[in-house]
Amino acid sequence: MTINTDIRALNEKIQLESQFVDLITMEMNKVIVGQKHLVECLLIGLLSDGHILLEGVPGLAKTLAINTLSKVIDAKFARIQFTPDLLPADLVGTMIYSQKREEFIVKKGPIFTNFVLADEINRAPAKVQSALLEAMQERQITIGENTYKLEAPFLVMATQNPIEQEGTYPLPEAQVDRFMLKVVINYPQKDEERLIIQQNLMKEFPKPNSILHPSDILKARDVVREVYMDEKIQKYIVDIVFATRKPADYGLAKFTEMITYGGSPRASICLAQAAKAYAFIKRRGYVIPEDVRAVCHDVMRHRIGLSYEAEATNLTTEEIISEILNTVEVP
């Protein structure tokens, strides 16, 4: 059997296995007006087992989007408002003494769920941020002397308000790097906002149907891993990430003094995983360069450090990524 035959068979399998993506999108569109990119990124994160950092002003349906997704796949959802007085125990749980049983018992925190919305994550102290990020990385929580596995799928969507920065605790670069995607959400278009008004003036707000089970997502993840990625695509991904570290090697010497640090190997891994998930969403069994380009900004924008010179000239990571994509040779 030739490679082409294998890929053709895999492609047919993916087309069949990915049909539920359209059903999820259809159910979410009943509730979410516009924000197609946000819905797409939620699916990428869900299918590639990656967490998402959202940046956008309040009122752009961030909570509604992840809550709706949890209902569509019949999963559990928790929204945690991060505040300066929040403690790690408020997040993960603690040991409490039961007078009835005359012993300490575990009271699990809200993080023991499938979908977590960590609202305004940069408002909580470093200890709380660290507790959340440990759960994201290890998929487990330690309370007292016992360690508890978190349910799968486990997806964290953390939000940051780009405008209000007073009284916040910015996330360290090492912790931000643990988010697979950083998605910037913009305001809806005029016609979309008119539909939002109409929707909210209806007698009953639309409700999504539960069409899947969390176990279906776990099965889908196994299929996503089977999506074929050629060595040329892998090299393309490595070149993109290396261009953020050594821009001069790729004819981008003008960025050498503008970038303080580039993407880590985790960036390469996340770019490959996100590209596979994107190909799956597009009902393909193989990754093409356009898949990598489609997810590149969301995967890389929080993994490039800008120097004072870059900030002084108003250079953004968006512009750097776009320039890299225009310069690095496409296979």
Where is each model-derived feature located?
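Walker B catalytic acidic pair
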Residues: 56, 119-120, 131
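Pre-Walker A (pre-P-loop) alpha-helix and adjacent loop at the N terminus of AAA/AAA+ ATPase modules
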Residues: 14-60, 242
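Canonical AAA+ ATPase core
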Residues: 98-103, 120, 124-128, 136-227, ...
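Conserved alpha-helical scaffold flanking the Walker A/P-loop in AAA+ ATPase domains
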Residues: 41-44, 97-117, 146
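Walker A/P-loop
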Residues: 46-83
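Conserved C-terminal "switch" segment of AAA+ ATPases
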Residues: 11-18, 31, 168, 182-254, ...
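C-terminal engagement/docking regions of AAA+ P-loop ATPases
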Residues: 1-9, 14-15, 247-331
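Conserved beta-strand position immediately N-terminal to the Walker
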Residues: 52, 116, 154
